[in-house]
C-alpha cells in the first residue's frame, strides 16, 4: 500500500558514503523495501546488532513514516478482524490470533527485520515483559515501568535506536546525528564525527568539540496561578478492573525543533493469566473527545484559533491509540493547545470508563 514512496537521491547516498570515508569508516547501508527513503547502518554506539541506527532525509519524513506505519497496522488489524466471528469473546479472539500468528506488532517487526534494525521498541518490549513478570496485584510504580519511556508510542519507538538515536539529513550538504534525552533535551553531532558519537554512547559528552551541540530547551516553570492554555502534558496511570487492568497514557507535546507536535491517548490492556500479568488482547478503547465521549473536543492553534476534532478507536487489542498530529493549519505549523473542559482523554475497558480532562492532568 505504501511501497514505492519517495527515494533518497543518489546524491544523498554518495554524500553519506563520502562522509564515512572522511571518518575512516566503511559503513554498509541497507535500504528499506517498505520506504525507499530510509536506510539502516551500524555505528559505534554500544548497541551490538547488524544495524543499530536509521537514516531519514528529514524529521518530517520520520513523522510521516510513523503515520504511515500506523495506517498499515490498522489495515492489517482490520483485515484480520474481518475473518473473526461476530461476538467472539476476548479469550477466544486471543486464542485465534495466536493460532494464526496475528499480532498488532507484526507490521513493526517486519519493518525492523527488513532493515536488520534493533529498535527502541524492541528493547522496551523485552524490558517490559521482564518487569511484568514480577508485578503483583497491588499498585504498580509508574516510574519503574519500562513502557513509560518519554517516547510513549510504540510506532515512534520503532524508528529510533535502542539509545534513542537517529540520523537526519537536514540539508543536501550534511547528515546530523541526534540523541534524544527527553522530550525537550537532546545532543546533536554534525560533520559525521563518529568519534564524538562513540564518546556520547559511553556517556561522555565532548563539550569542547565544535561538532557537538547540546540542546537544553528550558520549559516554562509551573506558574503560581493557572494558565489559560497548556501545550505540554504527559501522564501514565493504571486502572484496575478485577483480573483486568489498563494503563492510560495521555500526552500533548509541541517540540518545534524536531517536529513532534501531537495530542494522543493510548490504552494498554493487561490480564492476569496463570498467576502472571501480561499485555493481553481485550476489548479496549482510546479516544480524544469532548466531555461526553461522542462529541468533538476543542483544540487550539497556538492557544488562539479554536478547531474541533474527534477520534475514537475500540478494538480487541493489547493497546489502542488515538492520535491527532499537528500538521499545517491555515498556512501555519500547528501548535496544539488545550483549555479547561475542552478536550478529554478517553479510555475504556469493561467497567472502567474514563474521560479525563487533558488540562487538569497532573
Regions found by a protein language model. Name each.
Residues 6-9:
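C-terminal motif of bacterial Sec signal peptides marking the signal peptidase cleavage site
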Residues 12-233:
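Acidic/polar, low-complexity intrinsically disordered N-terminal segments immediately downstream
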